[in-house]
Curated annotation (Swiss-Prot):
Gene that this polypeptide is encoded by: Scoc
Name of this chain's protein: Short coiled-coil protein
Entry keyword set: Coiled coil, Cytoplasm, Golgi apparatus, Membrane
Organism (species): Mus musculus (Mouse)
Coiled coil: 43-101
One cellular component (GO) term of this entry: cytosol
Membrane-protein topology: Peripheral membrane protein
Protein purpose: Positive regulator of amino acid starvation-induced autophagy.
GO terms (BP aspect): positive regulation of macroautophagy; regulation of protein complex stability
Residue ranges, annotated region (Disordered): 1-31
Domain of life of the native organism: Eukaryota
Length: 125
């Protein structure tokens, strides 16, 4: 057989091709890669976790700030509502007192001779 037809003897194989054993190199290369990956994986996971933790921490702080702001606004709103109720009550009280005073003044005016019409006096002249 010719070299083109394939290898017929071990001599042709040895002279044409160099046999390289890949098993040891592959195992060593794979072990080396696996070792590097295993050593990098915790670092990457820790870095990822740190990034996630930092992001979560920022989000948590923002949520806490917003919750505190909402609670403060709710308390302010409750205080304003209580103040409005107090002002309404005071307004009703003052209206009632004004009506009483108005009625009292009207009664005094009708009973007083100073505020009587002067028709009788003008007829005497």
């Amino acid at each position: 057989m010719s070299k083109m037809d394939g290898l017929s003897t071990g001599e042709e194989e040895d002279s044409t091709f160099t046999s390289i054993s890949l098993e040891d190199d592959t195992d060593h290369s794979l072990k080396s890669w696996r070792s590097r990956a295993e050593s990098l994986l915790p670092k990457m996971m820790n870095a990822d976790m740190d990034a996630v933790d930092a992001e979560n921490q920022v989000e948590l702080e923002e949520k806490t700030r917003l919750i505190n702001q909402v609670l403060e606004l709710q308390h302010t709103l409750e205080d304003l509502s209580a103040r409005v109720d107090a002002v309404k009550e005071e307004n009703l009280k003052l209206k009632s007192e004004n009506q009483v005073l108005g009625q009292y003044i009207e009664n005094l005016m009708s009973a007083s001779s100073v505020f009587q019409t002067t028709d009788t006096k003008s007829k005497r002249k």
